[in-house]
């Protein structure tokens, strides 16, 4: 399975729901990037996705949104 990356925050209820859905679908190795912990990663997310909201999810190189 390709790498799954999710830009998230520690307090985002939608991120929690997205993580639970991914786990239900069999994703065991979710890479979470907490943009509230590391502001430089927020800039990375906004540059990469063109969006400011979380969650933002990538499966491999494919952006599936949030």
Language model features with spans:
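Local sequence-structure signature of Cys/Sec-based thiol-disulfide redox active-site neighborhoods
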Residues: 1-31
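Methionine-biased hydrophobic packing positions in alpha-helices, especially
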Residues: 6, 45-46
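Short alpha-helical
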Residues: 13, 40, 65
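Thiol-based oxidoreductase modules, predominantly thioredoxin-like and allied folds used
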Residues: 28-42
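Thiol/disulfide oxidoreductase modules built on the thioredoxin-like
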Residues: 47-53
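Non-catalytic, surface beta->alpha helical segment in thiol-disulfide oxidoreductase systems
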Residues: 59-66
């Amino acid at each position: 399975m390709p790498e799954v990356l999710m830009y998230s925050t520690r307090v985002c209820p939608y991120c929690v729901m997205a993580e639970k859905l991914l786990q239900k679908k069999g994703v065991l190795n979710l890479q979470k990037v907490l943009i509230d912990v590391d502001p430089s990663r927020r800039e990375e997310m906004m540059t990469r996705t063109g969006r400011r909201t979380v969650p933002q999810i990538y499966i491999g190189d494919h952006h599936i949104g949030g």
